[in-house]
Amino acid sequence: DWQKALFKDNTMSYNANINISGGTKFVKYFASADYVHEGDLFRVYDNGRGYNSGYGYDRINVRSNLDFNITKTTVLKVNLAGSNAIRKAPWSNTGHSEWQIGQQWSGAYNIAPDVFLPQYSDGSWGMYPLVSNTTNSAENISLGGTMQVTTTRINTDFTLEQDLKFITKGLSARATVSWDNVFVENNRGINDLFNSAQHKWIDPDTGQERYEQSYDTNNGFDWTQGVNWSTSPGAVDNGQTVRNLYYQAQLNWVRSFGKHNVTAMGLFSRQENARGSVMPTYREDWAFRTTYNYADRYFIEYNGAYNGSEKFSPENRFAFFNSGAIGWMVSEEPFMKFFREKKIVDMLKVRASYGEIGSDQLGPDPFDSSRRWLYMNQWAYGGHTVMDLNHTESIYTWYRESAIGNKDIQWEVVKKLNIGIDYSFLEGLFAGSVEFFRDVRSNIFVYGGDRSIPSYFGGTPPSVNKGKIRTSGYELELRINKTFANDLRLWGNFSMTHARNKVLVKDDQALRPAYQKSAGHSVNQYTSYIDAGFIQSYDQLFGAPAHDANDSQKLVGDYYIVDFNGDGVV
């Protein structure tokens, strides 16, 4: 049974933590330490090489929070946290690729139980020489070496809160600085990747043993297993070394004047992210928010943000986006008093919002240099020019333009419209919402390599903001909550979302037929051939439209593919 041969019946996994908290009038403190261990579910066989492979995970977390009451109106918060995690795995599987992980599991489900044993008494590993792709998962786990990957995280957070009521009632300020670091060390352990092992197969018909290594090719004597692995001291992975600096200043004001409630907020934030030796990325935001409500009945809100990103040229680096919202708490109106008193209507609110949001996401990796400096021309050094028809290369190295910039690259913009109703009836028995939404995304980023530009352009064209998509739909939510006299509770949540999108503008080829363009269809719309039944005779076969690929393989019984544009070729 390969499952029993590969997996333990159980494994150990545990967590231990200790917390301490307390304080005085001047300082309040909290500290904690936490340890996590995850054991290995695989059985690890003795490989005879002096080390044990397999999997494991250990992590320790520590945290300290200190709140200092510097004055009656000033509070300083210092939060420090760190963790150290060690992940152990076979050296050959530290990359965690799908193929490598599959090799650890394949024996449990792909190998018959009577083909070979995982390991024989003489230390050799089972094999099946008649089929090349049979995998001994026990060998894959036990050999190859063992590696430790150590991940260290350090997080610091300093916050200063100041009550400014001596200036005006309800005014306060808050400033935060955060500094986070991540370090990853790889390649510490034993590298035994390319050292051969002895394999054996026993013929079930004759009982004859067959060894893969019949003799040592170096000296001609019987093959013996030696200790040929090497130790690796480990090294910090520059590509996974991350440093994030974030600082923020915020001003808040909350005030009530009778039935009039007013709030205002102003915020500045800046973020610097760095990875390895790559230049840091920068993002800066200035934002404000104002709200007003009268007697918790009529609501109005206005927001604005002045966002800046290093990914755009100075002319387009900053952009202003704003939004507004209104609301009406119908259930608080005097004419709804009867329904409130009879506990028919708990809450009924109508709301609507409209606004803009900007995005500077030009690709999945913010440190990707091919998409980070798209607003400027890029240059590269290397290569030689060809001097003549004999392909003789020049002795001089090229300094060439590697990418054409576009200084007009700018923010992608989404305009959002939402109209909704929130409700609660019969003391919370039924509650939920109904919402209709419509988004129009414009200035969609199109990478130069994805543009519809003729090949005679001679290179990769500059990237552009050229695209527009509309999305609309609705969301329904219903919550049921009922508690009976015996404290039995019945509850349920139901939700439904329906959305449709349509490409309004796309960088389609100008002369391409409409049915082959993206514009006018959904995003990533699937397309396929249209058939008109089967080819039923050779007359129909020879009269069918030609296929632009493998036309000679077309036979009676195949689909008759419709020549949609009537040019005689499918």
What are these regions (language model features)?
Residues 87-100, 506-511:
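Low-complexity intrinsically disordered tracts that form flexible linkers/tails across taxa
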Residues 227, 502-570:
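C-terminal outer-membrane beta-barrel translocator/porin domains of Gram-negative envelope proteins
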Residues 14, 65-70, 74, 80-84, ...:
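Extracellular/periplasmic, surface-exposed regions of secreted and cell-surface proteins
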Residues 30, 47, 54-63, 305, ...:
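Short, cationic motifs built from Arg/Lys/His that form the positively charged side of catalytic pockets
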Residues 1-45, 232-238, 253, 546-565:
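Residues embedded in well-ordered regular secondary structure
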Residues 38-81:
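Extended hydrophobic/aromatic segments used for targeting, binding, or gating
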